[in-house]
């Protein structure tokens, strides 16, 4: 049987819509791209299991070899939505132009599975001693549903995991988490000519903002990690809206903010800090302040700094590991085994119009994956 080429697999991945979104009109599911991946990896000799996590949402686990431990190569199969008016190329077609592959998911990150496929296809498996697993998840771009489900139900425990997000082939050993909340203040609207007739939600929100800014200063003073370029947690006031007219007392005001906690700060502990910061304002204005999460919180992640896996992959990649401020599925997969984030392409291309991956990454990525498989599965 003639196996598909690297380019054919890459084109198949990019041409198959797998957008995930919290907006139902954009949430297209990943079943079709998972079906294609499952067949490609079966053709190379993997045993494959596809798990429906939710209707239209699937994870794929492919396995080559037997025994305990081994290496897990992981990533997400979904992409973000796109603004068609800002793209010069078809997002759902792999376009080769100026030594680049253009298309939605070329860098972030379902294109990674074409590299895994190619490395596996070229491998001589006759002396394999430990299994190689390939995990493709759903909904990383929204809820991390696929990674959460896999971690909670994992039928095996690999020795190590590599997540193929775009890191320019630099091993990433840690990143901050992400927590985003909405604070909704409900006042009482009325005519602005008599403030006593109402309760101004914007004025209450002013007190909320002051309390959160005090907490922001406290986080900077009390938490520090020298491994990060921005060594403290960050708290950002990102969006606010209130009122409907200059001559009305504002009856409702809503704030959206996010916090990026360092590794080691527990989500429960952070939630307690956030709620404690607003405790006095809530006591002053009972029943008028509501706090709700904007998405499932994501903890910070760090592979133990002296773990031999870091040194081993630094040797394979011939570069030192780093930390970053964006989020991946690593906090969840790290619960199973030491995990690094490492893949082709630049994070600068993620979620951008005309997303691309440079041809310069093709051979080095296949080489790094091949060396990693031989190092941890042979």
Curated annotation (Swiss-Prot):
One Pfam family matching this protein: Peptidase_M20
Predominant subcellular localization, coarse grouping: cytoplasm
Entry binding sites for Zn(2+) 2: 108, 141, 351
Pathway stated in the Swiss-Prot or TrEMBL entry: Amino-acid biosynthesis; L-arginine biosynthesis; L-ornithine from N(2)-acetyl-L-ornithine (linear): step 1/1
Keyword presence, ATP-binding: no
Keywords from the named record: Amino-acid biosynthesis, Arginine biosynthesis, Cobalt, Cytoplasm, Hydrolase, Metal-binding, Zinc
Cofactor: Zn(2+); Co(2+); glutathione
Catalytic reaction annotation: N(2)-acetyl-L-ornithine + H2O = L-ornithine + acetate
Active-site residues, record numbering mapped to chain: 78, 140
Assembly with partners or alone: Homodimer.
Function comment: Catalyzes the hydrolysis of the amide bond of N(2)-acetylated L-amino acids. Cleaves the acetyl group from N-acetyl-L-ornithine to form L-ornithine, an intermediate in L-arginine biosynthesis pathway, and a branchpoint in the synthesis of polyamines.
Assigned protein family: Belongs to the peptidase M20A family. ArgE subfamily.
Entry-linked NCBIfam families: AcOrn-deacetyl (TIGR01892), PRK05111.1 (NF003474)
Protein name: Acetylornithine deacetylase
Native source organism of the sequence: Vibrio atlanticus (strain LGP32) (Vibrio splendidus (strain Mel32))
Lineage, broadest ranks: Bacteria, Pseudomonadati, Pseudomonadota, Gammaproteobacteria, Vibrionales
């Amino acid at each position: 049987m003639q196996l598909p080429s690297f380019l054919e697999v890459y084109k198949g991945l990019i041409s198959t819509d797998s957008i995930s979104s919290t907006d139902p009109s954009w949430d297209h599911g990943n079943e079709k791209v998972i079906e294609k991946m499952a067949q490609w990896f079966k053709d190379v000799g993997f045993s494959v299991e596809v798990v429906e996590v939710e209707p239209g949402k699937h994870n794929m686990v492919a396995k080559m070899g037997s025994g305990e431990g081994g290496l897990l190569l992981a990533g997400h199969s979904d992409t973000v939505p796109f603004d068609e008016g800002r793209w010069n190329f078809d997002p759902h077609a792999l376009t080769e132009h100026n030594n680049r592959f253009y298309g939605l998911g070329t860098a972030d990150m379902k294109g990674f599975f074409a590299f895994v496929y190619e490395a596996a296809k070229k491998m001589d498996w006759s002396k394999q001693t430990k299994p190689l697993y390939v995990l493709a998840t759903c909904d990383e771009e929204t809820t991390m549903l696929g990674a959460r489900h896999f971690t909670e139900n994992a039928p095996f425990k690999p020795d190590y995991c590599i997540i193929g997000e775009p890191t320019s082939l630099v091993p990433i050993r840690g990143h901050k988490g992400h927590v985003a909340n909405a604070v909704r203040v409900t006042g009482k609207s009325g005519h602005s000519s008599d403030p006593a007739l109402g309760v101004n939600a914007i004025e209450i929100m002013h007190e909320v903002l002051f309390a959160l800014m005090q907490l922001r200063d406290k986080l900077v003073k009390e938490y520090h990690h020298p491994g990060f370029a921005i060594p403290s947690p960050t708290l950002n006031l990102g969006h606010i809206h209130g009122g409907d007219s200059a001559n009305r007392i504002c009856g409702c005001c809503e704030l959206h903010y996010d916090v990026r906690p360092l590794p080691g700060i527990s989500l429960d502990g952070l939630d307690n800090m956030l709620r404690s910061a607003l405790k006095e304002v809530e006591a002053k204005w009972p029943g008028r302040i509501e706090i709700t999460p904007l998405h499932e919180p994501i903890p910070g992640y760090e592979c133990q700094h002296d773990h031999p896996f870091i040194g081993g992959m630094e040797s394979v990649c011939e570069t030192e590991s780093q930390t970053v401020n964006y989020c991946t599925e690593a906090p969840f997969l790290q619960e199973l085994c030491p995990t690094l984030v490492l893949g082709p392409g630049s994070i600068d291309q993620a979620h951008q119009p005309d997303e691309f991956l440079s041809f310069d990454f093709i051979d080095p990525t296949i080489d790094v994956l091949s060396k990693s498989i031989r190092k941890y599965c042979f």
